[in-house]
Amino acid sequence: MKRTLVRPFITSAAMLLLAACSATGGPSAGEGVMVRQITQSAYCGLTGPGVAFVRSEADREALLDVCGQNMATDVVRKVDLSREALVMVTLGQKPTAGYSVGLQSALAQGESLVLDMRVNEPAPDMMVAQVITSPCAVLAVEPRGWQQIRVQGLTEQPLVRTLEN
C-alpha cells in the first residue's frame, strides 16, 4: 500500500520541479541584484518623494547632515562605500505619523536598478499624532556601474534617477 502512494507522489514532485525549472520570465524580467535595507526612519528631513545615490563619503555625510533627520546614522556610516553604494528612497512629507517605506524587491534590467518599494500608511480610522513626518529607507546596493535607478511604488509613476559616471 505504501509503494502505491509513494510512486505517484515522486512522479508529481518531479513534474512540478521540471515545470518550475523550465519557466522563464517575460519581456520585462530582470536578474536578481544584491540589495539590503540597512535602516528606515519616519524623520529623514527630506520634503519630496525622491531617490539619492551615494558613492562617496562626502555625499554620505551631506545626506546624513540634513536638518530634521532622526535615523540610525551609525549603521549608514558602517557601510563600506568601496564595496557597496547607498540609495536613499524618500516618501516626502506626510501630515501624520504612521507612514513608512521599505524595500519589497530589487532587480537589474540592463544598466538600470529597479527598486520596488512598499509604502505603509495609517488606516483611515487609526489615531495618529498630527506631526509632519518624512519617511525614508536607506539601502546598500552592489555597485555595477548603474546608469539609472527606477523606484516603483512611491508615486503613481516610477521615479527615475539618471546617474552620472
What kind of region is each of these model predictions?
Residues 1-19:
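Sec-dependent bacterial lipoprotein signal peptides
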Residues 21-165:
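Exposed, flexible binding/inhibitory loops of compact, secreted disulfide-stabilized domains
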